């Protein structure tokens, strides 16, 4: 898994590629910063797989942003990843575009 960070005007974008699984999810969690942010974006264009560990990281990041009064968006998930979000009900919780 590769992660690229971009911070601009209170908006942190994490561009992730590869698989978010049990081995890589802790690393992604370590990259999530919510303090002082108004928006957190996960660009999942090049993510091919998300396990339950990855879902946990995304859900916790969402909760932190809501508590901080900000918003979180997931952008460009591949069809297989979007299907995981649909099957788990995450499409009802998270903003996915």
Residue ranges and their predicted role:
Residues 95-97:
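Short acidic-hydrophobic, aromatic-tinged amphipathic segments that line or gate anion-handling sites
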């Amino acid at each position: 898994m590769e992660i690229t960070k971009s911070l601009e005007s209170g908006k942190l974008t994490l561009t992730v590629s590869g698989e978010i699984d049990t081995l890589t999810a802790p690393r992604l969690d370590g990259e999530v910063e919510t303090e002082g942010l108004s928006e957190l974006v996960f660009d999942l264009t090049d993510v091919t797989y998300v396990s339950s560990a990855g879902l946990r990281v995304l859900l916790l990041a969402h909760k932190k942003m809501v508590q901080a009064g900000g918003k979180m968006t997931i952008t460009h998930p591949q069809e297989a990843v979007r299907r995981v979000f649909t099957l788990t009900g995450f499409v009802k919780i998270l903003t996915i575009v």
